[in-house]
Structure formats: C-alpha cells, structure tokens
Amino acid sequence: AKPIHAGMGRESIHVGVAGNGQAAKICNNVLTGIHIAAASESLALGQRLGLDLNVLHDIIGKGSGGSWVMERYCPKGGILENAPSSNDYKPGFTNALMAKDVGLFQQTAQTEGLPTPLASAARSMYQLAINNGLGDRDCSIIFEMIGGKND
C-alpha cells in the first residue's frame, strides 16, 4: 500500500490494521477543526479589543497557544501569505469536508461511549457556515462568520 499512499501526502505512516488510517484521520482532523474554531474566536476577540493581529499571531505562535493552524493556516487574512484566509478563503479544506469529518469523529466516539463537547461545538460552527452558503469555502472562513474582519 505504500506506493499508493506515497502520492497522497508528504508522509505515509503505517497505523496498523484496516480502518486504523480512517480512525487516525478523523482524530487528526477534529483537532484541526477545533483549533481553527478556537483560533478564529481568539483572533476575532483580539481584533475587537484593538490588538495588532500580526503581533498577537506572533505572541500565540511563541506561546502555549501555538499550533499548526496558527503556524500555517491562520484564519485571519493577511498574516500568512499562503493561507486560504489570505486568498479569499479559496478552499484548502472546505466547511463541508470539515463538518463531515468532525461528524464522523462524533459518531465513532458515540459508539465508543465517549462524550465530545468540543467536537460538538466546532461542528456546529462548520454546519452554520454550510447553512449560510459557505459549504464550499475554506473552513477558516468561520473567522469572518463569527465577526472577524479581514482588511
């Protein structure tokens, strides 16, 4: 399977038996979805409080709030040149796909008897984006949806 997987991403990691790859994918994507939602809220509040978001982004990146999302996928446009937010939210990963993956995570967790309140909150945000006609836009557009402004 390695030759097939080699073209799918930068790195292929063997995770065991059939089905484990899907399990790892939804566990990873739910974290990304929650991080994007949290980063969007944090940056939107920082903006409302009058903070320079480039400075806030730098502080978060060097502090305990740093994450892949803030390093490579910042939901506020103009901070990271190659992020979807800096390119009119042209999709890297759509709201529809994020809602689907977070939903699969929730279904799987429910089957295992695991509560998922953070995943539920994040999925609600992505579903709201879909309901507002933004299903085909990048999932980081929730920054604007919750009131953040891109100048």
Which residues does each PLM region occupy?
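Helical "substrate-binding/catalytic lid" subdomain
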Residues: 20-121, 125-149
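Rossmann-fold dinucleotide-binding core
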Residues: 1-33
